[in-house]
Structure formats: C-alpha cells, structure tokens
From Swiss-Prot:
This is Nucleotide-binding protein EF_1165. PANTHER family: UPF0234 PROTEIN YAJQ. Keywords: Nucleotide-binding. One of its GO terms (cellular component) is cytosol. NCBIfam families: PRK05412.1.
C-alpha cells in the first residue's frame, strides 16, 4: 500500500454573512444604549467596506468597540479589518472606513512559506492565488506546521481548511 500524503490549505477569510449579522445586532444595541440616545451613530457595509459614522471621533471609537464585540462573538476575525483614519463627514459627523481583508497577499504568503521552509518540518508548501497548500507524509508534521503558523505575527487571521 502506497503512503498517502496529507494536506491542508492556509486561508484568510471573512464570512460576509456573519459580518452583516454582527452589524444588525450592533445597530440594535446602539438604538437601545442610553449614551447614544438622540445622537447620530450608524454602521453600514458598502462594497465589502465597513463604514462607521458618529457625531465625533470618540463616538466612532465607541461604535467600533460595540461592533468588534459582536464580530468576535460571531467568530469573525477582527484582525482582518483595517480601519483608515477618521475623517469629517457631512453634518459635522465623523466617519471611518474599514477594509475587510480576505485572502493572503503575495508578501504575507512569502513570509508564511519562508517560515514553513525554515522550520525544518518535512512538508511542502505551495502558494495558490490567495491561499497556501501544505502537504506532507505525516499528519503530525501538518499539525506542527499549524502550531508554527499560529505563532506568527501577521496582519491577518489564518484559518486551516481542506484537511485531508
């Protein structure tokens, strides 16, 4: 019987349905919160970008904190959301845009690949568009690679799927 290779994919994804659900729950909480009564506070999703609008920068940060709490409860990695600087909007309000990062860019894919190669674990890794496929003869080696990748300090959250 031939030795079968095991593999898994390293991906970085944001579940848009969960983001939409978290936004709805956060908006409900904003309507009921005493410190937001009568003030402007809104969260929208426009073209895969989060838009947070509030009366001032302080309230924008409060709205983001509420949203982050809801996203964490729904297992959406907040590491994959990169907010820009706050800017002035119409009506004296403040606005911030948040980019939702999905997929592993080439620069970070190379860092991950290099870390796997330098670890000395007997596996092969290939960059495939926005994910990385890791293959090896032993499932134990693959689990060592997963542990190694969890330790890396990257600007995105990594997930592992297609474990075979």
């Amino acid at each position: 019987m031939a030795a079968k290779e095991a593999s898994f994919d390293v991906v970085s994804e944001v579940n848009m349905e969960e983001v939409k659900n978290a936004i709805q729950i956060a908006l409900k909480e904003l309507k009921n919160r005493f410190d937001f009564k009568g003030s402007i506070a809104d969260i929208k999703l426009e073209n895969d970008k989060l838009v947070v609008v509030a009366e001032d920068d302080y309230k924008v940060e409060q709205v983001k904190d509420i949203l982050f709490g809801k996203l964490v409860k729904r297992n959406v990695p907040i590491k994959n959301i990169h907010f820009s600087e706050s800017e002035k909007a119409l009506g004296g309000t403040a606005r911030q845009y948040g980019d939702l990062i999905s997929g592993i860019d080439k620069e970070n894919a190379k860092k991950i690949n290099t870390a796997i190669k330098n670890s000395g674990i007997k596996v092969k890794s290939q960059i495939q568009e926005d994910k990385i496929r890791v293959t090896g003869k032993s499932r134990d080696d693959l689990q060592k690679v997963m542990a190694l990748l969890r330790e890396l300090d990257l600007p995105m959250a990594l997930e592992f799927n297609n474990y075979r």
